[in-house]
From Swiss-Prot:
Residues covered by region (Disordered): 128-166, 198-228
Native source organism of the sequence: Arabidopsis thaliana (Mouse-ear cress)
Name of the featured protein: Transcription factor MYB122
Protein task: Transcription factor involved in glucosinolates biosynthesis.
GO cellular component: nucleus; plasmodesma
Subunit structure: Can form complexes with MYC2, MYC3 or MYC4.
Length: 333
């Protein structure tokens, strides 16, 4: 449906309004009030279009129009209303008292819009420019870097999982090999002494500090064993169920979930192993004990052959490994 024009274009005056025309319009509106803009030009004796008369009155001649600079409250209201109505200036002007839609539009384009851009806000969406354009431009400008970074994260995660599984399998082998030997030696000590032994069970990680001190004090009283530093091992605590023959890394899946769990497991496992007199040695003596180092390296050699397809895989002796953190990680990685 086509809207009919408010008046005929023939004989109408266009361009700037004169002072005489303004006085005629003001006098007519004061006598008859606002409205009836289609018939007003003929009644007021004006050679203007009805729409032109309405806009001239609303934007310039209305007596309650507020002139001058916009206050901070008015600017905040304009920003909030623009976020709702967009560029519908007439709808915004109805919410701002004594301000015209044309004046609000001009103030938006010349002042408010520039201030929003300086603050990092998109004047169209009223959202942060960094949240939208910043992140998308970074990914679009460097798509290869972002994809490579994601691939590295996935690879590091997989390496950590493989490292945890291999470490658990290796610790299982060490505990299994030395655990059976300790059981055999402890039983031999029991038979040789012709009686039961006062045992000292290594406390687990769940034991409190008070119990540890009590346990350590009781250790000094158990001196009836011919074992170095008066430390004995409870044979029941090192039964065959303690050390599994299976090198399945899933056996310790819940224990070695992360680095801290691996550390606690290693301490608990080695506390049983190192309780035996053959293994009570300092770091220096361990390095000097070639048979001990040879057996540890042999265990690691067997583990590597089992997990790889090469039967001739060479493993550097453990006492020849660089003792730095990087060297240890490379050796067990």
């Amino acid at each position: 449906m086509v809207r009919t024009p408010c008046c005929r274009a023939e004989g109408l005056k266009k361009g700037a309004w004169t002072q005489e025309e303004d006085q005629k319009l003001i006098a007519y509106v004061q006598r008859h009030g606002e409205g009836g803009w289609r018939t007003l030009p003929d009644k007021a004796g004006l050679k203007r279009c009805g729409k032109s008369c309405r806009l001239r009155w609303a934007n310039y001649l209305r007596p309650d129009i507020k002139r001058g600079e916009f206050s901070q409250d008015e600017e905040d209201s304009i920003i909030n209303l623009h976020a709702i109505h967009g560029n519908k200036w007439s709808a915004i002007a109805r919410k701002i008292p004594r301000r015209t839609d044309n004046e609000i539009k001009n103030h938006w384009n010349t002042h408010i819009k520039k201030c929003l851009v300086k603050k990092g806000i998109d004047p169209l969406t009223h959202k942060s420019l960094l949240d939208g354009a910043g992140k998308s431009s970074d990914h679009s400008a460097h798509p290869e870097k972002s994809s490579v970074h994601d691939d590295k994260d996935d690879q590091n995660s997989n390496n950590k999982k493989l490292s945890g599984s291999s470490s658990a399998r290796f610790l299982n082998r060490v505990a299994n090999r030395f655990g059976h030997r300790i059981n055999h030696n402890v039983l031999s000590d029991i038979i040789g002494s012709n009686g039961l032994l006062t045992s000292h069970t290594t406390p687990t990680t769940s034991v409190s500090e008070g119990e540890r001190s009590t346990s350590s004090s009781s250790t000094h009283t158990s001196s009836n064993l011919p074992i170095n530093r008066s430390i004995t091992v409870d044979a029941t605590s090192l039964s065959s169920s303690t050390f599994s023959d299976s090198p399945d890394p899933c056996l310790y899946e819940e224990i070695v979930g992360d680095i801290e769990d691996m550390t606690r497991f290693s301490s608990r496992c080695l506390s049983h192993v190192l309780s035996h007199e053959d293994l009570l040695m300092s770091v220096e003596s361990c390095l000097e004990n070639t048979s001990f180092m040879r057996e540890i390296t042999m265990i690691f050699q067997e583990d590597k052959i089992e997990t790889t397809s090469f039967n001739d895989s060479y493993v550097t002796p453990i006492n020849e490994v660089d003792d730095s953190c990087e060297g240890i990680d490379n050796y067990f990685g």
